[in-house]
Amino acid sequence: MTSNDSQPHVAVTGAAGYIGSRVVTEIQEYHPEWTVTALDNFYLGDARTIGETTVEHVDIRNRDRLEATLDGADVVLHLAAISGVDDCEKKADLAYEVNVGGTDNVAWFCRKTGAAMVFPF
């Protein structure tokens, strides 16, 4: 753990989305002592704050910005994705860049730093 009191620092990608915003809310409710970093590119989600957590505008395709934002995270809950069938069909290149390239960036960060990666998809 990165903090002095051994409480985890949890980062959530896709935090402004339907699932991500609920996950952040649950973490805040059941583990208010944890440090939470929330990030999203605001492609579809529009939550700018969740409880007392500000959602940072970060695109997971930008490795440098992602690394700077995730710095210090012990766990990354990777919930960012282009998931709608229509979006994936109409914007196939974007879906690939986010779902494959962006996920690769998150995994790269976790490998580099030793952070755990939770990827439920």
Give the residues covered by each predicted segment.
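Haloarchaeal acidic low-complexity proteome signature biased toward cell-envelope/secretome components but also
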Residues: 1-8
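N-terminal Rossmann NAD(P)H-binding glycine-rich loop of SDR-like oxidoreductase domains
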Residues: 10-30
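Conserved glycine-rich Rossmann-like NAD(P)H-binding loop of the short-chain dehydrogenase/reductase
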Residues: 32-44
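Short alpha-helical oligomerization interface
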Residues: 85-101
